[in-house]
Amino acid sequence: MNIGTVPIIACSFLLPTSSLLAQSESKDSYSEQAKFYPSEKIEWKDGPPALPKGAKVAVLEGDPAKEGAFVMRLLFPGGYHIPAHTHPRTERVTVISGALYLAMGDKLDRSAAQKLSPGTYGFWPSGMKHAAWADGETVIQLHGIGPWVITYLNPAEDPRNANKSL
């Protein structure tokens, strides 16, 4: 056998295998698992107690309250704001519509905020201190690893503490 025939023989063994792999991973094999969420069919619910009243949420994948990956959309009414806070895990946010303003630091400093327009993607690392507000009705898509936790820098601004002072 000459050295030039070795690659040809090796390829002849690999071709049937790669053909089988391609068949097992065909587009049709994934159709039962695919899920689509047209914007007009998304079912919005009241936001979680950890967010100020007025937010709406739609969980698209996973469960933000449990360990593991999740995707959720948040709808904020115009003027809605979230006081300065942190998250123990990285957040990945895409603005779908409206405008989200993000200010880094201990307080909601509107003069130092970054405007995130539709289509903007943002990545905020775990522990980053930030505040946000919506200019007009705003929808964002948040990707994260649960459980999703928000810790307000000022406990008095945490909506979960509102009823504790009564």
Residues covered by each model-derived region:
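Double-stranded beta-helix
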Residues: Q33-K35, S111-Q114, A131-L166
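Bacterial N-terminal signal peptides
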Residues: P7-S18
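A short, N-terminal "cap"/entry segment at the start of jelly-roll beta-barrel domains
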Residues: Q23-F70, Q114, E157-L166
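N-terminal post-signal-peptidase region of extra-cytosolic proteins
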Residues: V57-L60, V71-Y80, A84
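Short beta-strand His + acidic residue motifs that chelate non-heme Fe in jelly-roll/DSBH
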Residues: I82-A84, L102-A103, W124, K129-D135
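Glycine- and acidic-residue-biased ligand/ion/polar-headgroup-sensing regions
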Residues: P77-Y80, T86-K107
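Positively charged n-region of N-terminal signal peptides that target proteins for export
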Residues: M1-T5
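Short acidic-glycine-tyrosine-enriched beta hairpin
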Residues: D106-S126
